[in-house]
Curated annotation (Swiss-Prot):
Gene: gsfJ
Bilayer topology term: Multi-pass membrane protein
Protein name according to UniProt: Probable efflux pump gsfJ
Family from the record: Belongs to the major facilitator superfamily.
Function field: Probable efflux pump; part of the gene cluster that mediates the biosynthesis of griseofulvin.
Biotech applications: Griseofulvin is a spirocyclic fungal natural product used in treatment of fungal dermatophytes.
GO molecular function: transmembrane transporter activity
Source domain of life: Eukaryota
Compartments it resides in: Membrane
Organism of provenance: Penicillium aethiopicum
Amino acid sequence: MDKQNTDSEKRATAEAPPQSLCTLVSSSEQGGMDITNHNAKAGAADEYPHGVRLAAVVFSLMLGMFLVALDNTILGTAIPKITDEFHDLNKVSWYGSAYLMTFGCGFQSTWGKFYKYFPIKVWFLVAVFIFEVGSLICAVAQNPTTLIVGRAIAGFGGSGVGVGIFTIIGFAAPPENRPQLLGFTGATYGIAAVLGPLIGGAFTDKCFYINLPIGGVAAGTIFLLFKPPTSASPAKATPKEKFLQMDLVGATLMMGLIVSYILALQYGGQTHSWKSSEVIGLLVGFFLFVLAFVTWEIYQKERAMIVPRLFMRRYISVGSIYMFFFSGAYFIILYYLPIYFQSVYNSSPIGSGVKMLALIIPLTLAAIVQGWALSKIRIVPLFWIIGGALGTVGCGLFYTFDTETSVGKWVGYQIIVGFSTGWTFQIAMSNAQVHAPPEDMSQATAIVNFFMTVGGAFFISAAQCAFSNQLIKTITKNLPELDPTVAISTGATQIREAFTASQVPIVVDAYMVGLKAVFAITIAAFGVATVIGFFGSWKKLLADELEKATGGVA
């Protein structure tokens, strides 16, 4: 079996529950693993690390997953403070979109090809190094542009780290133990999701320094203790074929269309009129990039980052489109709830992180329950519809937020949205793993993940556009003597210091109007996702199909 198929197998076990690390080490030390013919080429048992070496490798992979997960959640509560330092609220969408754009928009497929055709260990260390460089740039950034560039570099490196973790797992333990390793990484992701808002709130603009020692330990451990088995040797191909497999043209076109889209929404109604040549030109460029990207991917066929043959299959297309809208709504909430708490409630960054635990803890618990529930219910659209409907209701309740919303309400509403997100987020990936044949599994899961991250980048930008336009419109109407750009350039946590006592309530109300526009977008996104969920296959999954997606532990 080539490396791509091995990668497919280890991805297919992602829903397995975590088990004790001691149990894993012990079972690995016993040797004599029963490896099936299907997985025989994943490496002989004596090539796998054992004992302390295995524990160290697993620990380093958990650190790597912690890094990737933390960077998805740490920034939300830090953003309002960062806007204070840079005096620019208008760049908020870029702080999130820049990372998501390079983290998932085609580059996961590219990194997968790197791990297939080049030494795994070397390129994993390269990915960690790139991520660390991006984090360092973010940490020392003195202006928004530098921070955005750092976020983009970190996203590209983080994409390689994420793909590399799952690839190394495929060669760090025999097939029957891989679900346990994936369970550890899954648990680590949940821990990072909980700690991210707290760390971001506590360290605010210095939060990026945290990545440096963690990444250093992870890279050092892999460098010293992980020895790739002979089965992990790079796949044979000509230099030309290796280059073509990267689909760098597709990745470039995708970057072009996302940048055009983000800039159009950033300029429109804020620094330029919607009818200006700049905005119209960017929107036209966006649609031309979309057309070019689709045409190129069809032409590339099996070399494409989005293989047309796979995307036309219902279990991938419906799940991918569903997650485009669903994850878009989730990322908006992750980035704009802290702004609500810090601007309207005057919470500190760490205070807003504590308040968001009402969202993150139910999300994590629901994600754990979801794996068990899927093995019992086995009807995928039910999860999509329930999750989307709860998200729609929860965000509808978010829309009722005002400057005097009680604690009970904002806690309860977050619990609803958190549960809906955790209940649903992994279903599309599991469904792809269930139905895709082994040779297509890595590509199938990559397509679903691609749409998840692109959805985040698109909807964060749309939310920022709506927020800024409504903020400007409201201040212009209710406080005409104040230049709206002053409110935009004032950080969310500096409202009460930057404006007079008579102006503060009006500016806070303007923030609330902008946030209501943001929440309206999440209502629409969750609602569209709910409708799309009805188009999934209602055929009940078979037990052996679920075993395929959970490594035989469903």
